[in-house]
Amino acid sequence: MGICLSAQVKAESSGASTKYDAKDIGSLGSKASSVSVRPSPRTEGEILQSPNLKSFSFAELKSATRNFRPDSVLGEGGFGCVFKGWIDEKSLTASRPGTGLVIAVKKLNQDGWQGHQEWLAEVNYLGQFSHRHLVKLIGYCLEDEHRLLVYEFMPRGSLENHLFRRGLYFQPLSWKLRLKVALGAAKGLAFLHSSETRVIYRDFKTSNILLDSEYNAKLSDFGLAKDGPIGDKSHVSTRVMGTHGYAAPEYLATGHLTTKSDVYSFGVVLLELLSGRRAVDKNRPSGERNLVEWAKPYLVNKRKIFRVIDNRLQDQYSMEEACKVATLSLRCLTTEIKLRPNMSEVVSHLEHIQSLNAAIGGNMDKTDRRMRRRSDSVVSKKVNAGFARQTAVGSTVVAYPRPSASPLYV
């Protein structure tokens, strides 16, 4: 169940791996245990009590969103639609458009495949937790067949939008902001993995990282979250759910879920931030469609790292920073689960890299500049060669291919 809390959602490409798609690939037979699912409740009995949440009436949310008018839609998908609305900051009652607190109201389709269980997980997790890097759930509505969630409005939308949109009117995220977003998201995951919470997020990806007005990252979409293992258990066995390109290989193979599964997903997103490429893009040449597989050989070679780095980031980082981010990404992506860092370690590494960026101020030495020019020259030649080949056969050149990372289907 995805969260689309910004006015920028409509800018997403129709081919994107969105937060609205189905995520379940079903049972893996003997390799994974199925999750026992209780019947969907028709009362608030299964909702954990939380003083932080308000139980809204359907009429209140209808008024707050101007009767769910089409021009209030922020986004839509398999779960239903997200509407923009306004409520009074103190009373939390509906207010006139443009006044009070801006909210995002997610309205679940009554016959939507994402269903009540994910809605319930969202309410219970976000209702119990409060952290600056988790999106704030203000309240919910459970009335008759209506299922709605009320969130704080995130004015800058998702990381996915900022990282992959192209065009004359869109400014790419700077290196400094990418580090800030990565660190904020890492802190959110570290909080979930802490001994006090013990939650496995299970769907960490760019579309689930939302940004406030100051580009502070907040994790959204807790419909797939699971309680972590307890006692002497090392993992949770469950059906494999998530998004292709982000799920850890051992989780795909066995259905065994651990916090290190989230660490792998973080490594993928860190690589997306570094490269400006999507985790999976079927519109790229066959050898470049899977970002992790394509990038790994370059990341282990200091002289080839610049072939992976987003060429829109010229002169914004030092060689030392680039190498450290590449190394951290590789550590998160290793197939040896025990060798992956925990998220607290990741936070420490990113804080160090961020301090390097602040100290260096974007200045590079002569070696950095020489290697950058060489890398840019290689990239430019490849782009021009590709352009010439496509033009020669009379095909349309797509400067910015549609993304194609997809959810895990049955």
Swiss-Prot record:
Coiled coil: none
GO biological process: defense response
Domain Protein kinase intervals: 68-352
Compartments, record wording: Cell membrane
Binding residues for ATP: 74-82, 106
Lipid-acceptor residues (S-palmitoyl cysteine): 4
Protein name, UniProt field: Probable serine/threonine-protein kinase PBL9
